[in-house]
Each structure stands twice: as C-alpha cells, then as structure tokens.
C-alpha cells in the first residue's frame, strides 16, 4: 500500500496520483484492481448512494459504515475518509473525538477536512495525534449554502488570493495533501507548483499533482447528469437495467428457474414425507 511518503515522492517525480471516490466493497475492489493509488470515501455518499439532497445529513456513523466496506474491498490501497458536516467545527475536543472514532472503528488511513478558516488548528491537532489529514479547498460541498451554490471558486483576485493563502496555511498546519475542487486551471497549477504537498484536483485542470473523480460518474451508474469536469468512461446503467428486465420477464413467464438452477431430492424421501401423495 502506498503511504504519505510515496505520494510525496510521486509529486516530486511528476507522477500523477490517481484518486477515486468509492463507497462500498464492490467499487473499492474494482478500484484497487484497476490500479487506483488512493480511494476517498466521500460524504457525497449521502447524495450518490443514500438518495439525500445534500451531504449535510451524513453522520459519523455513516462514514464509519461505508469506510469499513471500502477497506474490506481495497486492503492494499490508501483510504481517505471525509469527516462529515459539523463533526469537526463545534470544538477541538469533539473534532478529535469524532476523528478518533472514524479511524479506530473504520481503519481509515487519513481523514479529509473541508475549509480553511477555523480548521487549521484542527489539522494541526489531528496531525500531532497521528492522524494524517487531507485538506479540501475551493468548492466545499458542506459549505455550498454559504458559497452561493455549486460554482467555480477563485475567479476574482480577492477569492483567488484567499485560496492561495488558505492552501499555504493548510500545508503549514500539517496537511499531507490538498484537494482543490472547481478552481480555475491556471490558479490550481500555480498552487500545485508552490506547495510541497500533493495537490489533487477535481474540476481544477490538468496542472495539479493528481485527479479525483467519483466512481459512479466514471462508470455512468445512477447519475442523471454529470458535471462539466467529469469524463465518463462507460455507461453501465443500460446493461444493468436490461439484465434486470430480463430477470423480471423470466420469472413472470416461469422461464426461470430452470432445472439447472434447482436442487433435487430423492423421490422416495419425498414420498416418505408426504405419504406418496
């Protein structure tokens, strides 16, 4: 399994880091088989697999549950888990308690924290406590209400300057890596070159040290529409639906199950049970 040191070396040698967001055992297993370097168990699971309207309702228990499944499917891949909404904002003490619970119960290799202001102290405390932290700046879904929706961040001088400063402070606080989401490509590239830690982009252009996308977006599963920054490599929903329709039709027409799918019992045993009736 790659470690923090390996990811730093990959950045230094210009080798792109491949990260994928996955939420369960089958997806994690496929991700590892495909050669993904790092798996993110994102709180986006609330919308993608739980059918919620946002990430706000996702709990620490949800993150532990899904991370356990991912770790079982990808035993040799570095797994990062999101700390969900308000699990690290109320106090430093509660943040440390929640972080410890996630790591101890799920086996996560690192935790991801969104935002800059108000989070730097927590990054430092977790790092000192032995928990690696991945920071997340730009479009931060947990704060989408404050940001005014799902919009590109850092397009003007003031917000771009703030992103640069927050990126520096995340590194100084001890973050092992930084995720930049929905940030202009040129800005993300400049930040990537300035920082010594790996910068992983999602909707942040090709100049970052790595890329992350959501499994369901990549394979075309259960998504009605995809963001501009997504490249879809398959459309698996259609063959899945066709398979299910075939099953429904076969059951209703009594084509399934056939003899090949059934188990046999000696006729004498059956007659003994029912008296030859």
Swiss-Prot record:
Binds 1 Mg(2+) ion per subunit. The active site is at 181 (proton acceptor). It catalyses: 3-methyl-2-oxobutanoate + (6R)-5,10-methylene-5,6,7,8-tetrahydrofolate + H2O = 2-dehydropantoate + (6S)-5,6,7,8-tetrahydrofolate. One of its GO terms (biological process) is pantothenate biosynthetic process. Its EC number is 2.1.2.11. Pathway: Cofactor biosynthesis; (R)-pantothenate biosynthesis; (R)-pantoate from 3-methyl-2-oxobutanoate: step 1/2. GO terms for molecular function: 3-methyl-2-oxobutanoate hydroxymethyltransferase activity; magnesium ion binding. SUPFAM superfamilies: Phosphoenolpyruvate/pyruvate domain. Its cofactor is Mg(2+). It comes from the Bacteria. Gene3D superfamilies: Phosphoenolpyruvate-binding domains. Keywords: Cytoplasm, Magnesium, Metal-binding, Pantothenate biosynthesis, Transferase. Disulfide bonds: none annotated. Mg(2+) binds at residues 43, 82, 114. Homodecamer; pentamer of dimers. Belongs to the PanB family. Catalyzes the reversible reaction in which hydroxymethyl group from 5,10-methylenetetrahydrofolate is transferred onto alpha-ketoisovalerate to form ketopantoate. This is 3-methyl-2-oxobutanoate hydroxymethyltransferase.
């Amino acid at each position: 399994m790659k470690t923090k040191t390996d990811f730093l070396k990959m950045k230094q040698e210009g080798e792109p880091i491949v990260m994928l967001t996955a939420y369960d055992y089958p997806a994690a297993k496929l991700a590892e088989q495909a050669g993904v370097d790092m798996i993110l168990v994102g709180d986006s699971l609330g919308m993608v697999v739980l059918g919620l309207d946002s990430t706000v309702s996702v709990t620490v228990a949800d993150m532990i549950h899904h991370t356990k499944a991912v770790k079982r499917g990808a035993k040799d891949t570095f797994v990062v888990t999101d700390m969900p909404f308000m699990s690290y904002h109320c106090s430093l003490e509660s943040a440390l308690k929640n972080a410890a619970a996630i790591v101890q119960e799920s086996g996560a290799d690192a935790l991801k924290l969104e935002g800059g202001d108000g989070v730097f102290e927590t990054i430092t405390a977790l790092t000192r406590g032995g928990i690696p932290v991945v920071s997340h700046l730009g479009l931060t879904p947990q704060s989408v209400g404050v940001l005014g929706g799902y919009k590109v961040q850092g397009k003007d001088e003031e917000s771009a300057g703030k992103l640069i400063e927050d990126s520096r402070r995340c590194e100084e606080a001890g973050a092992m890596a930084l995720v930049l989401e929905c940030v202009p490509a040129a800005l993300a590239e400049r930040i990537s070159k300035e920082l010594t830690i790996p910068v992983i982009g999602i909707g942040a252009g090709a100049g970052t040290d790595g890329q992350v996308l959501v499994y369901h977006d990549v394979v075309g599963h259960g998504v009605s529409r995809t963001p501009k920054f997504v490249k879809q490599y398959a459309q698996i929903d259609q063959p899945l639906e066709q398979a299910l329709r075939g099953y429904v039709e076969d059951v209703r027409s009594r084509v399934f199950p056939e003899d090949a799918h059934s188990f046999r019992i000696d006729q004498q045993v059956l007659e003994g049970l029912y008296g030859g009736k």
